[in-house]
């Protein structure tokens, strides 16, 4: 009898989640494409005096080749290291001075960067994203690549090699996908 009550309670709890499944969250937005092909999605919310800029590139570790992995994640790091009009070290410094929180991440299918900052600093975030998108090569050097390669290696040691079960995130994809599938290797490289 006790098992029956527990089972009934579980089904009741699971079923109660479906009662709200019909509700949809509607977020109004405007979507347009710039002449250079960049898709822009804008959602306005004036309830707080902050703005978020989120730039997504349709490239991730899934775009890499067998035996040549980790480049998407490496470039995620390199794109913080200055560009044609932004000296090395100034990207984060300028954003922090404006009261921003920023970061980037890489997955199998995308690399993204975001800035969350006061509304009056929107132009700064757009300038920085535009400059790193258009003028990265002006500031590239073998030293920057080597420096960030070392940072990524250290990140791998901290988050995978020296963590309980950390290696599982490297082993799991190898066992879920065929060796030639772009999801069979870890994002970090």
Q: Residue spans of the language-model regions?
A:
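Hydrophobic helical h-region of N-terminal Sec-dependent signal peptides
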Residues: 9-13, 17
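Alpha-helical protein-protein interaction elements
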Residues: 10, 24, 48-49, 65, ...
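A ubiquitous, low-specificity "background" feature that marks scattered single residues
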Residues: 11-12, 51, 79, 135, ...
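Acidic/histidine-enriched segments that form metal/cofactor-coordinating
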Residues: 57, 83-84, 90-189
